[in-house]
């Protein structure tokens, strides 16, 4: 009986570590989607301010651009995927730092279920995706599918 409980706890810890890794990969996919969107906006149809666009592209190419990114914050029950923006207003206490600006989604630490946020602290009621389903997991980890603005999280 005790041996079974130990094995069960080991499996739970393994599942949690996979969910954490998938949540981080999911955040990277959303960040890549934003990067692709930003580059597309700068290059596609001719930017209304070409000097600004060229300056932005040069910063991206030399690695000094501070683009919006998505990061995972660990909570008691959920991983919170947070949109972080670089603060450029010099009156802010976060000047020249990334700061969390909004919640993109929640990922259940136990199951890998993905939720749209209802508020900063709480997910919406209905599960939108499940990382235990291989098809849905592959969908979430592909940057072409996950929109940085979160449109894919609305009920289908």
Indicate residue ranges for each PLM-predicted region.
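Negatively charged, low-complexity tracts enriched in Asp/Glu with abundant Ser/Thr
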Residues: 3-71
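Polar low-complexity intrinsically disordered regions enriched in Ser/Thr and small residues
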Residues: 11, 49, 66, 78, ...
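Exposed beta-strand-loop-beta-strand "reactive/processing" segments of non-cytosolic proteins
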Residues: 58-105
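A short, surface-exposed interaction/processing loop segment used at functional sites
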Residues: 111-143
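Cysteine/selenocysteine-centered motifs that mediate thiol-based redox chemistry or coordinate metal-sulfur cofactors
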Residues: 145-156
């Amino acid at each position: 009986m005790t041996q079974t409980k130990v094995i069960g706890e080991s499996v739970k810890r393994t599942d949690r570590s996979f969910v954490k890794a998938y949540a981080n990969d999911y955040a990277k996919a959303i960040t890549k989607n934003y990067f692709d969107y930003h580059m597309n906006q700068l290059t596609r149809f001719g930017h209304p301010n070409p000097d600004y666009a060229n300056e932005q592209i040069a910063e991206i190419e030399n690695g000094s651009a501070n683009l919006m990114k998505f990061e995972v914050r660990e909570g008691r029950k959920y991983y919170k995927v947070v949109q972080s923006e670089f603060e450029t207003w010099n009156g802010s206490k976060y000047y020249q730092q990334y700061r969390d600006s909004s919640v993109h989604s929640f990922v259940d630490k136990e199951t890998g279920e993905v939720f749209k946020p209802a508020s900063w602290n709480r997910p919406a009621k209905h599960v939108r995706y499940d990382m235990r389903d291989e098809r849905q997991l592959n969908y979430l980890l592909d940057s072409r599918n996950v929109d940085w603005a979160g449109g894919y999280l609305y009920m289908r």
